[in-house]
Structures are given as structure tokens and as C-alpha cells.
Amino acid sequence: TAPHFGVGQSFLALALLECQDMKKLVALVATITLASTSVVACTPKPVSAEPVAEEFLQGMESRNNDGLAALTDAPSDATSALDATYSGLQAEGLDIELEGMDQDETLATANYKVTWDLPKDRTLSYDTQMTLTKTEDEWTVRWKPSLIHPDLGANQHLELRALEAKRASVVSSNGVELMSPGLNYRLVVDTSSLEDVRPTASKISGALAAAHRQDESIADIDAKDLAKKLEDADGSYSVTMFTEDQAKAVRPKVEGMDGVRLNEEPALVTRDRGLAPDLMSRVRSAVQDEVDGQTGWSISVVNENGAALSDVEKHAPNAAPSIKVGLDYDVQRAAQEAVNERSDSQAMLVAIRPSNGDILAVAQTEKADEDGDVALQGQYPPGSVFKILTAAAGVENQGLNTDSIVPCPGTMDIFGRVVTNYNAFALGSVPLSQAFAQSCNTTFADISTKLKPGELKDMGKKFGFGVEYDIPGLTTITGSIPEGKEPLERTEAGYGQGYDLASPFGMALVSATVANGKTPTPSLIEGHETKASDKPQRIPKHVLDNLRAMMRQVVTSGTARSMAAGGTIYGKTGEAEINEGSHAWFTGYREEDDIAFATLVVLGGGSDASVNITSNFLQKVDDYRSGPHKGAAPPAEG
């Protein structure tokens, strides 16, 4: 077999044949060897930078800091910047896709797409690039912050930041802001940090007593009671909550106490602290999940001091829409001021808008508050205000009208039950409208007795009375009417005695039905649906026409003729007798401003007490709506 010679060996063989002198041979071999080496060195192509780029990007994805450090010229800067961005973005994952390489012998550029997985299913995607250089046959990543994001400079990182949405206000039906976004402050004790809680309880009690002397709205706390609660607590214990104004008085007195802190909390702050505090508290509880709006977010370029320099992505927040309640600021103030004129009594007033069922006002004196939400839930004999329903039943079931002649003797014996008018007054035989206006008990006892069992109860439900309502934010009871299987039950029910029971809320709803033509669905918070046990029915026109005429006559020439408020007012008075005395009632509506009302003074005697309160109420409504202070709420109180 012929010998095989490589490129260098061929040159060498040729030289051996031609060289005759050994010195020349040695020199020639050296020359040929050098030439051979030069040829081999120029032959291979440059090695690709792509594997190094891919390894670096994989290290970024997996946060392999050791691997990254070995591939870049600034390992400490690279790893710290990447860690800062991971942390700043609260990143849940990172995906990087190499999209292309540009390369020559010693310089390469890698182009890639970066996608960050962020909390709450959010992502951030963008394109960027890195530069690699080759030295001594090795490719190295030249570190720049732009490897992470093209907008990053030295000592900068990316950061995910929440953009808080404007929180919702609570607005009255007449457009006044009742509650606005603000802050409350919770006094918290960390019991785990205290060996003995008793000294702390004593200090807190003393601090609050001192603050109470500055602001009477700050409640005192008994040191012994607090110590017992702290001893039973496990970890943090919430002592009480303060408004922003109250916290100003409390903070200097509790600062520095071991284990004690004031925590700031977002809250709906009442602008007028004296306005229906119980009602405002109920509204606040009902809408607390609706006030925050939709938080936005941004990705910012942030320096080492935490200052945001620019945004690389931004999603604006969506402010929560205002929450509207049926409460009317002017009507509520007027109602509260009116009942407070009888502060010595359990006086209360409920106002409803007949056209849509908005609960405009619920007002009670402090004495009434002692028994709870009696304006909405209290059950009292309604007395003669109930004659609205008896009259409606007589018109619909017995064919009566305002001109029908009915008996109104001073007393009437009905199946052994002697019914008596107030002071036994007697009118003789008179039109139904006059008997209604003068409130003849005997007339309506007679009408009711002649009804069939259940007819009066059914009529009540047509006016919302006896219907069960589930009103978000409120608990209410309208009232009850007996079935009337026994004649005596029907007799007493006809003029609001016996087993008839009513709340001011229930009677306000009856008057609202007369005004509207069918029972409006009562509601407190717009968008919070009220559920009712019975579907409202439209009252026949002839029934409404007769009722309206009779209720108007009560005010113009009947038992409510002392009404001094302006406007076209319809009503019915009532004095409900009980063993201890009698309750004073008045219910009705004013045509011009779409207000139905019911007023009750427990043990108030004659109905004049409630007529006077209602008259003052309507006059105050007019004053508020026409005066310079119209709809003016004070600044938000902390």
C-alpha cells in the first residue's frame, strides 16, 4: 500500500529528496514546520456565542445566581439587580425566549423576549437584548441593567406598585355626601409582649379618661374590666376604635406604652356625626364590600432609594361609584329635630317616598332608643290611623263612598262590646267623609264588624301592612291584623284596637300606598334589592279617590286642622288607648314633595302631640330646602 502523506508530510518528503546537505535539511524542516502550523491556525471558524447566551437566559429564569456569575463580567451587579427586580415585581415566574443572534468573530448580540408572571394573573412582556464579547476563545456576557429591561439604568430595578382606586362615598337621595372615605384608628394591645397586663390596662384607662375630658365622645374604659379581657386574650387584643379627631386626643396619651399601638384603618367616615348614627352604622356594614373600587397597577423603574422614575406599564384604577341611599339629608335632619322637641317622651317619625319607596328618614328620641329600633319594628295599637284600612275595605267590599250616610252615635253596642267615641261625642247619621274626618270609632267598628273574616287583613296587605320585607341594612315589621273569625275581633280591629298592632314604618307605608296608588317597595340602599312576602297590587281608582278625599278633609276641617305646615297635606289622626294611657298617632303624606310619614308619641295622649311634631317636621323640611344651608353637610369628621 502506498504511504499517505498529510500536507506537512508531503512538503517534508520532497525536501528529503532534494536536500543533499544536512544543515540545509535542518533549516528546511524548521521552515516547513512553521508554515504548516500557520496553515492549521487559520482554518477553524469562530465558535458560536449562542450556547452562552442561552445558558445565561436560563440562569435568569431559574435564578441560578452561581451560573449567572460565571458567565458575566459583573457577577455581583448582575445577580443583585436581578434579585431586586424579582422581589420588586413579586414575580411568580419568568419565561425568556431567545429570538435571534447577530455575531462576528469577537462580538455578538442576543435578542430575546421576556415575560414575567405577576400576582393576580398579571403579566409583563417586552423585548430586550444582551451583548457578548469573545476573549481568549471564551464568550462573556457584558453586564448592563438593560439585560433585564431596556429602560433600566445603573442601580435601578423594576417594581410592581398598586394604584389605589378612589373609594366610594355614600350619598343621600338629595345628593349630599353622608359618608366619605377616611381613616379610623384601632387601639391594639399585644398581650404576648407583656408579662403583666394589669399595669397596661390601668394606663390605658387613665389615658382614655384624660382624653374624655377633652372630647366627651371618647368613652371611658374600666381598668379592671380591660385587664380581665387582656388576660383572656391570645396575642393582639382590640380595645376600641377612634375617629381621626378622637385619635388626635388619644395618641399623645398612649404613645410609648409597651405593647400598645394605634393602627390606622380605612373607613367610611360620617360627615355629620349626629345624623342617624344607628342608621349610618347599618349602611356602613351593608356597603363595606362595595367601597374599594378596582385597584390599578403599574410597573415602575425604581432607583436604590425607592423613588419611581418612570412607568414601563400602567393600568389605571377604576374608582368605586358613589353609593346612593334613600335617606334624604334634609328630611332626616328635620325629622330628628322635630321629634327631639318631645325629648321627654318616646317619640318617633318615619318618612318614605311614595313614588319609589326610598326610606327618607327614621328618627327617634333618646328615650325611644332605649327600647331599640321601635320606629321600624315596634308594635303598638294603631288606634284611629287604622281607619284608613277599614275605610278602604268598606269602599271596596261594601260599596261605600265619601257621601254614604253612616251612623256615628256616641256609643254603640256591637255583640255585647260597647264602642265609645272620644269623650262619647255623637254626630248622628253623617256622610262617611265626616265620620272619617272626626274619627268616629262607632262608625268604623260597625263597618269592620260587617266585613267577612279575613277581608280586613287582606286589605291591609294591599297597602303593604302585614307584608314581610327583607330590606338590606334594616330590620322592619309593618304590623298585624287578626283574621277576625269572631265578630268581636272584627269590631275592635276596625278602629285600631284589639289585636291590631302597627309600627310607624308600617303606617308610613300605608300612607305611601294611598299617595302612590300601590305599595312602593321600601328600600334603603340603591342596588340592594328588597324582598317582599307579597307582590304589591294596584289599588282600584275608586278606592283611592275616596281615601284621598277623606284624608284631605281630616287636615282641612277634621282632627288635624291644627296642621300649620304648608302644602297639600293628607292625613289621619289616631289615639290608641291602652291601660297606662294612650298613644298619639298621625300619618299621611304631602303631595308636593313626595313625602309620606307616620309619627308616634308613646303615651303621648291626644293626637295633637303627633300632629304638632309632624307640622314642625314639614316646616323644617321647607326651611332646609329653601334656606342658605340647603343640603349642606359639615366637613367629614374623623
Named regions from a protein language model:
Residues 43, 92, 97-99, 105-106, ...:
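Conserved SxxK-family serine transpeptidase/carboxypeptidase catalytic domain
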Residues 45-51, 65-111:
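Short solvent-exposed beta->alpha transition segments
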Residues 147-164, 179-189, 194, 198, ...:
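Short pre-catalytic segments that frame enzyme active sites
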Residues 347-378, 393, 397-603:
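Beta-lactam-recognizing serine transpeptidase/beta-lactamase-like catalytic domain environment
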Residues 39-41:
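C-terminal motif of bacterial Sec signal peptides marking the signal peptidase cleavage site
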